[in-house]
Amino acid sequence: DAGEAEEGLFTYVFQPSQHTRSRQVTSAQLWFHTGLDRQETAAANSSEPLLGLLVLTSGGPMPVPMSLGQAPPRWAVLHLATSAFPLLTHPVLALLLRCPLCSCSARPEATPFLVAHTRAKPPSGGERARRSTPPLPWPWSPAALRLLQRPPEEPAAHADCHRAALNISFQELGWDRWIVHPPSFIFYYCHGGCGLPTLQDLPLPVPGVPPTPFQPLSLVPGAQACCAALPGTMRPLRVRTTSDGGYSFKYEMVPNLLTQHCACI
């Protein structure tokens, strides 16, 4: 928005973007269309400064430190001093530009504009400390996965080979600062002996097809069968993790962790 008062005082209202306000300003220029040619500009500067810049604050207009730089004909480029960069962090910026010899132009191509160069703000002390903290050991290492082993055997309703379940809490494991979802999961594992056949966890029979008598699977003749997951039936566990305290997240998949079917192998 722009307005013009007496004695060549122009008022402009700028609204810096959220992107600009959230970053560190490294340079800023105000481009203003004077309408004056080079001779008129030189003559005006010989007697007194051609342009003056003020900012409207709650305490009234305050001067903005700046310097004039190279500019195309009929334009002026005002380079804001470093001390003025914080002005671009305000959602609304009202600038008063004094140019006694300039005239207001309604042409779109003569509209003044601000140019700001920015970069990401350096992290604060707390953020630097968080980011410099050594990363946690990779939780899916063999040593950590041993935490998911089955508990000591307890008397069960039946001792035959079957699929058992255990609720795993990532908070109890101390992984809740790394794994943010799910907070827990049901860990299935195979448990029991292979002295008697079990049909509990085998695939359901197909209608019209006679059931196949149970036979323990054996990979080595004469070897003793043990209760284990059927090959090819393990499913992955999907989790959402963070390594920087919640600033970013990553979806990960742990393969072959959840048992679906058990058998004597």
Curated annotation (Swiss-Prot):
List glycan-bearing residues: 45, 167
Query: PTMs?
Result: Proteolytic processing yields a number of bioactive forms, consisting either solely of the mature alpha chain, of the most N-terminal propeptide linked through a disulfide bond to the mature alpha chain, or of the entire proprotein.
Any single biological process term in GO: hemoglobin biosynthetic process
Q: Which GO terms describe its cellular component?
A: extracellular space
Q: Which cysteines are joined by disulfide bonds?
A: 161-227, 190-262, 194-264
Q: Which Gene3D superfamilies match?
A: Cystine-knot cytokines
**Marked site: Cleavage:** 131-132
Note the PROSITE patterns from the entry.
Answer: TGF_BETA_1 (PS00250), TGF_BETA_2 (PS51362)
Q: Which domain of life is it from?
A: Eukaryota
Q: Which residues form the propeptide?
A: 1-131
Q: What is this protein called?
A: Inhibin alpha chain
Gene source species: Ovis aries
